[in-house]
Amino acid sequence: MSDRHGSGRAARPFLYVVVCAAGVAEDVGELIDAARERGWEAGVIATPVAMGGFFDVADVEARTGRPVRSAWRTPGDPRPFPAPDAVVVAPATFNTVNKWAAGLADTLAVATLCEATGLGVPVAVLPCVADALAPHPAYGESLDRLRGMGVRFGDPYTGEAGEGGGRPGFGWERALDLLERP
C-alpha cells in the first residue's frame, strides 16, 4: 500500500490492532507478540472505554514501541502510525461492531474501522459478545453488513465459564490466520 498518511513505511507490513472494552483485552499482548513473530509491526488503537483499565497500556506501548492511540490528533501533529496493511479488531464488542456497521465514526477506533473498510484494507475481527447480546437483531444485521464489505470474522467468544467452570482461551492468533486466507 502507498503511504496515505505521510509518516513513512514501516520496514515490515503494518498492522493496526483495534482493542475494545472486554475482559479478554488484558491479554492483547499475546496478539502483538504473535503478529511480530509472523512479520508484522503493530500499532494499537483502543476505544476510550478500553483505555480505562481493560489492558496494560504501558506494556502494549513497550511491546509495539509506539503510543496507544484512542483520541484524534490535532491537525499539526505528525501521524504516529504508517498506513495499515491490515487491521485486526480484537476483542470486538457488541457496541463497536454495531457502530462500525452503521458508520457511526464517533471514536478514533470506529472511525479507523470505517476508513479501513472504505479503502479496502483487509480487516479481521474476533467478536467478544455476551450470550444475552448476540441474538439482538441489530447485531446479526451488523455482522451481515460487515461481511458484505469483505470483513473476515472469527468464531464468536462470550467469555462465559464452561461446564468445568473455567473460561475458554481467546484465540488471538485466529485473527492473523484470517488475514492470511485469500
Please identify what each model-predicted range represents.
Residues M1-P182:
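A cross-family phosphate/adenosyl-ligand binding-site feature
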